[in-house]
């Protein structure tokens, strides 16, 4: 009986350590849990680094809402931009950053929900070490969808205050 108990306890200890090690590892390019296909590579004039967009709900006159999934590779980010009716981000995996003009950069992670107010300049993207996957929701598209601005500089991307 004692050898069975020792074997069972040893198995539980190794299982626990293995799970702990896996959960504390960094989330890089290939380690995010994909919910949707990667989609199309975002245009270089709107993104620094590689960001992939997969549309989920197309714009129409009934729902007037766009929904899609964006995957940012580590270090990738959007340009500064605005949305006439605002934007909601639901972070589904990874770690990244979001910043509203004039405010401190915020760290965002899986499970976070970010509300970008209408006509307020902001950017979002992956952290240095981790990819970021997000759902975006753009409501009231009859007001317009997005106005792209200039790229986020390295200084802005790295500035934490």
Segments predicted by a language model, with ranges:
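Short acidic-glycine-tyrosine-enriched beta hairpin
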Residues: 102-119
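Bacterial Sec-dependent N-terminal signal peptides
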Residues: 1-26
């Amino acid at each position: 009986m004692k050898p069975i108990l020792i074997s069972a306890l040893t198995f539980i200890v190794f299982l626990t350590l293995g799970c702990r090690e896996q959960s504390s590892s960094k989330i890089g390019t290939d380690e995010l849990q994909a919910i949707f296909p990667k989609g199309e590579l975002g245009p270089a004039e709107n993104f620094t680094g590689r960001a992939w967009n997969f549309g989920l709900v197309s714009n129409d006159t009934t729902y007037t809402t766009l929904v899609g999934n964006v995957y940012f590779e580590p270090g990738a980010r959007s340009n500064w931009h605005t949305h006439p009716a605002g934007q909601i981000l639901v972070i589904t995996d990874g770690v990244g950053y979001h910043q509203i003009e004039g405010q401190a950069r915020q760290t965002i992670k899986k499970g976070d929900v970010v509300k970008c107010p209408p006509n307020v300049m902001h950017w979002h993207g992956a952290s240095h070490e981790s990819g970021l996957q997000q759902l975006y929701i753009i409501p009231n598209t009859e007001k317009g969808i997005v106005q792209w601005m200039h790229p986020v500089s390295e200084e802005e991307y790295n500035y934490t205050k």
